[in-house]
Curated annotation (Swiss-Prot):
Name used for this protein in its record: Large ribosomal subunit protein uL11
Keyword RNA-binding: yes
Family per record: Belongs to the universal ribosomal protein uL11 family.
Ribosomal protein found in the keyword field: yes
Keyword entries, A-Z: Methylation, Ribonucleoprotein, Ribosomal protein, RNA-binding, rRNA-binding
Subunit structure: Part of the ribosomal stalk of the 50S ribosomal subunit. Interacts with L10 and the large rRNA to form the base of the stalk. L10 forms an elongated spine to which L12 dimers bind in a sequential fashion forming a multimeric L10(L12)X complex.
UniProt function note: Forms part of the ribosomal stalk which helps the ribosome interact with GTP-bound translation factors.
GO cellular component terms, semicolon-separated: cytosolic large ribosomal subunit
Cross-referenced InterPro entries: Ribosomal_uL11, Ribosomal_uL11_bac-typ, Ribosomal_uL11_C, Ribosomal_uL11_C_sf, Ribosomal_uL11_CS, Ribosomal_uL11_N, Ribosomal_uL11_N_sf
PANTHER family, A to Z: 60S RIBOSOMAL PROTEIN L12, LARGE RIBOSOMAL SUBUNIT PROTEIN UL11M
UniProt cross-references to SMART domains, sorted A to Z: RL11
């Protein structure tokens, strides 16, 4: 017999750093999900990833208090900041550029993010990522 789905919860958790403290603990606790069980499973699943990278996770929880979760790739902004060695984006994107990024780096980001983007091909994914780069104040070169 199939489990009754009680709902879904979307969180962004640093890789390998899930703890029962806020915001994770309260979000899971009010839905009756075992917090420590999730933290251990999440940390085990993300141990191969870069520590501290924000990982979007979709938690599906059931009426019997069990859960499953699926991991996504980190946000495009994380990859762009990492590739351009930035702390944050521009306060005035389009007017003030805080750095540059090459099309080769955008291509590598697009390949990494392809499974989470709703693009049909790599060129469309690259255009999406270029738009994100411009909105962060990065100049696309090459």
């Amino acid at each position: 017999m199939a489990k009754k789905n009680a709902g879904q919860l979307k969180l962004q958790v640093p890789a390998g750093a899930a703890t029962p403290s806020p915001p994770i603990g309260p979000a899971l606790g009010q839905r009756g999900i075992n917090i420590m069980e999730f933290c251990k499973a999440f940390n085990a699943a993300t141990q191969e990833m870069e520590k501290g990278a924000p990982i979007p996770v979709v938690i599906t929880y059931y009426q019997d208090k069990s859960f499953t979760f699926s991991l996504k790739t980190p946000p495009v902004s994380f990859f762009l900041k990492k590739e351009a060695n930035l702390k944050s984006g521009s306060k005035e994107p389009g007017k003030v550029f805080v750095g540059t990024i090459s099309r080769d780096k955008i291509c590598s980001i697009a390949e990494a993010k392809m499974k989470d983007l709703n693009a049909n091909n790599i060129e469309a994914a690259m255009r999406m990522i270029e738009g994100s780069a411009r909105s962060m104040g990065l100049e696309v070169v090459g």
